[in-house]
Amino acid sequence: MAKTSWKVKANRAPKFKVRAYTRCQLCGRSHSVLRKFRICRICFRVLAHQGRIPGIKKASW
């Protein structure tokens, strides 16, 4: 889990736009965040398996 201070810092508008970075809305992870859902790959996988993300299902071929 990310520190609360990191989550607060990520929500603030940066002084320059290029300094902005994505952070998972659920756990605060900064790496591997899916922009469309604003959550990390780990949280995405858990929520997808639970069926809590509409339109997403496990691939099978």
From Swiss-Prot:
Zn(2+) binds at C24, C27, C40, C43. GO terms for cellular component: cytoplasm; small ribosomal subunit. The keyword Ribonucleoprotein applies. Keywords: Metal-binding, Ribonucleoprotein, Ribosomal protein, RNA-binding, rRNA-binding, Zinc. GO terms for molecular function: rRNA binding; structural constituent of ribosome; zinc ion binding. Its cofactor is Zn(2+). Binds 1 zinc ion per subunit. GO terms for biological process: translation. Part of the 30S ribosomal subunit. Contacts proteins S3 and S10. PANTHER family: 30S RIBOSOMAL PROTEIN S14, SMALL RIBOSOMAL SUBUNIT PROTEIN US14M. NCBIfam families: PRK08061.1. Belongs to the universal ribosomal protein uS14 family. Zinc-binding uS14 subfamily. This is Small ribosomal subunit protein uS14. The gene is rpsZ.
